C-alpha cells in the first residue's frame, strides 16, 4: 500500500509540474551511485551534465572536486573515489609509471586543445619563410607543440621521437622557421614579437584567450592528448563503467559541450 501511495504521489508531482519527469524516473530507478573525482572548472561543469543524464539511466554520480590535480589519481588508487575525469592519457601513463597505480583509461572525454595564437597573422597561410615562432620549453609542452606543427605540415619529426619530440628531432622545416623555446609564463609576452606562439589550453585561459575565438589554428579533437575517464584496473569491466561512459558520450552532453564552450573544448568521440 505504501508503495502504491508513493507512486501516485510521484505521478501527481510530475503531472502538476512540480518535478521534471526525468528526475522522477531517476529517483525510482537509480541502482548504484559512483564517486567521480574532477578538478574545478571545465571537468566539473561537464560532469554535472553527465550526472543529469546518468540519473535518468539508473546511475547516480557524486561529483568530488579537487583543487589539487595531483591528489586525484591517489584518491582513485586508494579507493576514495570510483573514477576520475581530469587528465589526458599521457599524464595518466606518466603517473602509472611513476607511482605504480593500477589505473586504466576506459574512454576519451574532452580535448583541451593546444593552439597557435598570433597578433601578426590571420591564418597560417600568411606565415612567411624564416619567421620566428615560440613554443613551450618544458619537455611535455615542446613535444605537444611540435606534434601540432607536424600535423600542420610545417615540420617533420623523426619517427622514433613520438610524443617525446624535441627540437633535435626536427628533420624537416619547409619554411626555415626559427624556434624560440620559452618558459610557459613568458609565452604570452612573445605574442608581441613572434609570428605565432603555441600555448596550451590551461595557460591560454589564464591569459584570457579562447582557442576557438582567438587562435589561428588548434589541435585536433582526437589528439593523443585527449583527456580520459579513468578507473581502477579491477573495475574496468563492471557495468557501471559502461553506464558512465554512455552517459558522458550521450547527445545531451555533446550538446552541452558545444553550446557551453563552442570549439574551445573539443569532443574526441
Language-model-derived ranges and their functions:
Residues 30-41, 61-65, 132-133:
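Short, well-ordered beta-strand elements
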Residues 40-62:
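Short, polar/charged alpha-helical segment
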Residues 41, 65-69, 79-93, 110, ...:
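Beta->alpha turn/N-cap motifs
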Residues 63-74, 161-189:
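Short helix-initiation/N-cap motifs at beta->coil->alpha
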Residues 94-106, 119-121, 193, 198, ...:
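Ligand-binding "clamshell"
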Residues 106-156, 254:
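A conserved helix-loop-strand patch within extracytoplasmic ligand-binding domains
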Residues 108-118, 143-150, 205-269:
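Periplasmic-binding protein-like
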Amino acid at each position: 500500500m505504501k508503495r502504491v501511495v508513493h507512486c501516485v504521489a510521484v505521478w501527481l508531482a510530475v503531472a502538476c509540474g512540480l518535478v521534471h519527469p526525468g528526475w522522477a524516473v531517476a529517483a525510482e530507478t537509480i541502482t548504484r551511485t559512483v564517486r567521480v573525482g574532477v578538478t574545478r572548472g571545465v571537468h566539473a561543469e561537464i560532469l554535472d551534465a553527465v550526472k543529469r543524464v546518468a540519473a535518468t539511466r539508473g546511475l547516480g554520480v557524486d561529483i568530488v572536486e579537487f583543487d589539487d590535480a595531483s591528489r586525484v589519481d591517489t584518491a582513485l588508487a586508494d579507493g576514495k573515489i570510483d573514477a576520475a575525469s581530469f587528465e589526458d592519457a599521457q599524464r595518466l601513463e606518466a603517473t602509472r609509471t611513476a607511482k605504480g597505480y593500477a589505473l586504466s583509461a576506459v574512454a576519451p572525454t574532452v580535448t583541451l586543445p593546444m593552439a597557435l595564437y598570433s597578433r601578426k597573422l590571420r591564418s597560417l597561410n600568411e606565415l612567411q619563410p624564416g619567421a620566428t615562432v615560440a613554443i613551450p620549453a618544458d619537455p611535455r609542452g615542446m613535444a605537444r607543440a611540435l606534434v601540432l606543427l607536424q600535423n600542420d605540415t610545417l615540420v617533420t619529426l623523426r619517427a622514433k621521437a613520438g610524443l617525446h619530440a624535441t627540437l633535435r628531432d626536427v628533420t624537416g622545416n619547409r619554411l626555415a622557421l626559427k624556434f624560440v623555446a620559452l618558459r610557459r609564463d613568458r609565452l604570452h609576452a612573445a605574442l608581441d614579437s613572434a609570428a605565432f606562439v603555441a600555448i596550451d589550453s590551461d595557460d591560454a585561459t589564464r591569459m584570457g584567450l579562447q582557442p576557438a575565438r582567438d587562435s589561428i589554428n588548434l589541435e585536433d579533437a582526437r589528439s593523443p592528448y585527449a583527456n580520459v575517464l579513468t578507473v581502477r584496473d579491477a573495475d574496468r569491466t563492471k557495468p557501471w563503467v559502461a553506464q558512465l561512459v554512455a552517459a558522458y558520450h550521450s547527445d545531451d552532453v555533446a550538446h552541452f559541450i558545444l553550446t557551453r564552450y563552442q570549439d574551445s573544448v573539443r569532443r574526441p568521440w
